């Protein structure tokens, strides 16, 4: 046997499974390239820049669409709120605008930056260790700047008064407004943690329940607080309207407390190891169904005899 044939045989054996199973082919290792494009995972600065760009574009797209829809709802004379309450059609239009806008924005940019689009969500993700503190700060800056840019763009492109800023209504006090914002944000952030962070087969559909939860939050809170549940949304609208009420702080403190509350509930479930319990329940249910099916089959066989 020539030396070339021997080398070819050695190379072939190196590609086989070391256990000796000849049909288990293992492809040869590819040479490591030195091109910087293939080391992007180690380029932290570039990764942060991509995340910042994704959060800016996603937040801008979400809030610009929502602001314009909100402006239309509040300018339409047929949907003007009565002095003693809000028009149902007005609430539904605003809620649909925000819910659907965040839904398609998350679907577009979740693969780029995670699609938080909300400083309160970013805080919950950071507390859950889904993103690093540095990435959280980067996302915060992008989201807040995008909120102000979206507010300015919506104000410049639509005629008339800016009518998408948050304000208290229906006699709601600052304390009540604080807790409404807190619990509304908690529901939204908990939805994110349970549908996007938790490993499930339905993670790819997380944008749908997130959009639905924001829709419900707007139906519930708009008449009382204008529904902030997002500091970037509240700040962007306030800058565009040049309207900063003395209670503007509730749209920051309330939402951040809500994100912490959502994380606390999620963390409690992790401590209780709820996934093990759910898995055991599913296994027991499957076993019980299999036993019943076996008993039914046995009974049918006896009856035939």
Swiss-Prot record:
| Record keywords, A-Z | Cell membrane, Endoplasmic reticulum, Membrane, Repeat, Transmembrane, Transmembrane helix, Transport
Motif NPA 1 in this chain? 118-120
Which GO terms of the molecular function aspect are on file? water channel activity
Report membrane topology: Multi-pass membrane protein
Question: For bias kind Basic and acidic residues, which ranges apply?
Answer: 286-295
> Which residue windows does the record flag with biased composition (Polar residues)?
296-305
Q: Where is this motif: NPA 2?
A: 230-232
What InterPro entries does the annotation carry?
Aquaporin-like (IPR023271), Aquaporin_transptr (IPR034294), MIP (IPR000425), MIP_CS (IPR022357)
Which ranges of this chain reside in the Cytoplasmic compartment per its record?
A: 1-48, 113-136, 198-203, 270-305
Location of the region described as Disordered in the Swiss-Prot/TrEMBL record = 1-34, 286-305
Q: Domain of life here? A: Eukaryota
- The residues on the Extracellular side of the membrane are 70-91, 158-176, 225-248
**Pfam families per the UniProt record, alphabetical:** MIP (PF00230)
Where does the protein end up?
Endoplasmic reticulum membrane; Cell membrane
| Transmembrane segments annotated in the record for this chain | 49-69, 92-112, 137-157, 177-197, 204-224, 249-269
Q: Which GO terms describe its cellular component?
A: endoplasmic reticulum membrane; plasma membrane
PANTHER family from the UniProt entry: AQUAPORIN TRANSPORTER, MIP17260P
| Entry domain remark | Aquaporins contain two tandem repeats each containing three membrane-spanning domains and a pore-forming loop with the signature motif Asn-Pro-Ala (NPA).
Family according to the record: Belongs to the MIP/aquaporin (TC 1.A.8) family.
Q: What does this protein do?
A: Water channel required to facilitate the transport of water across membranes. Involved in sporulation, freeze tolerance and osmotolerance. Is non-functional in most laboratory strains.
| Name of the protein in question | Aquaporin-1
What organism is recorded for this protein? Saccharomyces cerevisiae (strain YJM789) (Baker's yeast)
Give the classification, highest ranks: Eukaryota, Fungi, Dikarya, Ascomycota, Saccharomycotina
């Amino acid at each position: 046997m020539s030396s070339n044939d021997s080398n070819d045989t050695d190379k072939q054996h190196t590609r086989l499974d070391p256990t000796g199973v000849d049909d288990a082919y293992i492809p040869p290792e590819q040479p490591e390239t030195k091109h910087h494009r293939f080391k992007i995972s180690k380029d932290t600065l570039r990764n942060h820049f991509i995340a910042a760009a994704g959060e800016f574009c996603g937040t801008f797209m979400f809030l610009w669409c929502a602001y314009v829809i909100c402006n239309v709802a509040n300018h339409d004379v047929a949907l003007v709120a009565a002095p003693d309450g809000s028009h149902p059609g007005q609430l539904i239009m605003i809620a649909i605008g925000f819910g659907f806008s965040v839904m398609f924005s998350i679907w577009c940019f979740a693969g780029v930056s995670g699609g938080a689009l909300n400083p309160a969500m970013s805080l919950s993700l950071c507390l859950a260790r889904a993103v690093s503190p540095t990435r959280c700060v980067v996302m915060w800056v992008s989201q807040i700047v995008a909120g102000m840019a979206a507010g300015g763009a919506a104000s410049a492109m639509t005629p008339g008064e800016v009518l998408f800023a948050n304000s208290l209504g229906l006699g709601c006090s600052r304390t009540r407004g604080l807790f409404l914002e807190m619990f509304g944000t908690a529901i939204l952030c908990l939805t994110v943690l349970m549908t996007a962070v938790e490993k499930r087969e339905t993670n790819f559909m997380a944008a749908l329940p997130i959009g639905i939860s924001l829709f419900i939050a707007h139906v519930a809170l708009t008449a009382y607080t204008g529904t902030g549940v997002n500091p970037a949304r509240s700040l962007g609208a306030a800058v565009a309207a040049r309207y900063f009420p003395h209670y503007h702080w509730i749209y920051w403190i309330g939402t951040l407390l809500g994100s912490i509350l959502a994380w606390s509930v999620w963390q409690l479930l992790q401590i209780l190891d709820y996934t093990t319990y759910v898995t055991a329940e599913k296994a027991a249910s499957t076993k019980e169904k299999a036993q019943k099916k076996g008993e039914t089959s046995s009974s049918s066989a006896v009856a035939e005899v």
